[in-house]
């Protein structure tokens, strides 16, 4: 009797791994099956993972898909759009959305060796190498044709516009893959808009970050692209079970500072005429970010902002809980800067300790606003009045938030 044994070779989970170096970054692309991978880096071929550094983790299947172009990324229950890949060269063709993508920011010049491993069993499934060098990373133009010429905004005022919660800046002109300081892992993509309108350089970032899971603890969200109240989020946001061992980090502020520095160098606006404004969550960011950077902004306009995140009244501090922690935020919960989170997000305390070197502030609140608690505001205004030399304008209405129809 003859027994015939037929062995079928399993298809490789990753193939055609390529590495391209430019502008201080390495772009890794590959074809894949339904594969979750980690990325490792070393200065020699990787045979032993203990001698390499893990630089990317929790990369989901089809990481080359441009989730920014999918409405379901931002609104719970929204149907998915047609998958499209990221555009990683100025005005270039999009990647195959079924493939993989990871972007590494180079810290040391030389030949770099990369390996992809299966997240399930840490088995090396692909490797490659490339010669690369550090450099000034830059955003990628997302429109057809060529980006604006350097200096197109020379001498013009700059306006940083921060959107409200639930918002997203559609058709943004630029895409950047951040370094390890800008997110819970290296290579996270974020988009932003810069345009010259009516004699101004208008900068509109988007307060969204991909966490690879539904953000169900945020009752009004549940999407995998979360909002952060223009501050940041927990360093372990990718896994709810690990957040208690993580740290609140101002990733979003770091992204905004990078954007503004790049716009300063490329568009060349007048450094003495920078302004920041926003409504609702955008107003919150105007106070917690813009107003607290007097070296950047001459004036700020905050429409119905939270000025201090506390548990007074309806408890505005609860807005930080879903992204920064696992529940009630204790007074001693520290950020990555070693400052208690609730102190860092307390503009009343900031005014009392800073003195008078702050931007001009225009602010509007509603006493009966159902979304932004009034309880924090009187002490803030008293602190403004007590601080020498501070200038501001205050407008008040009842239920201003609802009458304007602003989400928060």
Q: What are these model-predicted stretches?
A:
Residues 163-199, 204-215:
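Short, surface-exposed "cap/lid" segments of acyl-processing enzymes
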Residues 271-325:
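Primarily recognizes the serine-hydrolase "nucleophile elbow" in alpha/beta-hydrolase
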Residues 95-105, 109-111, 119-176, 187-192:
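A domain-start/cap signature at the N-terminus of enzymes
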């Amino acid at each position: 009797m003859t027994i015939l044994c037929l062995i079928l070779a399993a298809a490789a989970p990753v193939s055609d791994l390529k590495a391209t170096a430019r502008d201080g970054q390495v772009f890794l692309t590959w074809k894949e099956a339904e594969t979750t991978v980690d990325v490792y880096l070393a200065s020699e071929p990787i045979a032993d993972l203990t001698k390499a550094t893990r630089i990317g983790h929790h990369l989901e299947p089809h990481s080359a898909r441009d989730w920014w172009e999918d409405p379901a990324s931002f609104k719970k229950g929204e149907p998915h759009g047609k998958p499209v890949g990221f555009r990683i060269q100025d005005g270039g063709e999009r990647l195959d959305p079924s493939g993989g993508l990871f972007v590494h920011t180079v810290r040391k010049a030389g030949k770099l060796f990369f390996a992809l491993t299966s997240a399930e069993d840490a088995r090396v499934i692909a490797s490659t190498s490339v010669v690369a060098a550090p450099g000034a990373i830059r955003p990628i133009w997302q429109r057809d044709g060529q980006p604006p010429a350097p200096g197109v905004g020379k001498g013009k005022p700059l306006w940083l516009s921060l959107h409200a919660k639930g918002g997203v800046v559609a058709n943004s002109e630029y895409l950047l893959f951040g370094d390890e300081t800008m997110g819970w892992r290296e290579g996270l993509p974020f988009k932003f808009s810069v345009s010259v309108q009516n004699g101004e350089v208008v900068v509109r970032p988007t307060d969204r970050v991909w966490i690879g899971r539904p953000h169900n603890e945020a009752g009004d969200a549940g999407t995998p692209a979360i909002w952060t109240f223009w501050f940041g989020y927990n360093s372990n946001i990718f896994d709810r079970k690990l957040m208690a061992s993580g740290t609140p980090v101002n990733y979003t502020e770091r992204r905004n500072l990078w954007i503004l520095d790049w716009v300063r160098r490329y568009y060349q606006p007048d450094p003495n005429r920078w302004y920041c404004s926003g409504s609702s969550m955008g107003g919150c960011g105007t106070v917690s970010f813009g107003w607290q950077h007097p070296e950047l902004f001459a004036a700020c306009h905050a429409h119905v902002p939270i000025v201090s995140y506390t548990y007074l009244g309806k408890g505005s501090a609860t807005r930080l809980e879903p992204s920064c922690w696992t529940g009630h935020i204790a007074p001693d919960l520290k950020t990555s800067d070693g400052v208690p989170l609730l102190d860092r997000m307390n503009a009343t305390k900031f005014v009392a300790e800073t003195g008078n070197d702050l931007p001009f502030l225009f602010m509007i609140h509603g006493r009966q606003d159902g979304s932004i608690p009034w309880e924090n505001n009187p002490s803030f205004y008293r602190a403004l009045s007590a601080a020498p030399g501070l200038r501001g304008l205050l407008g008040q209405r009842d239920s201003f938030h609802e009458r304007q129809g602003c989400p928060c």
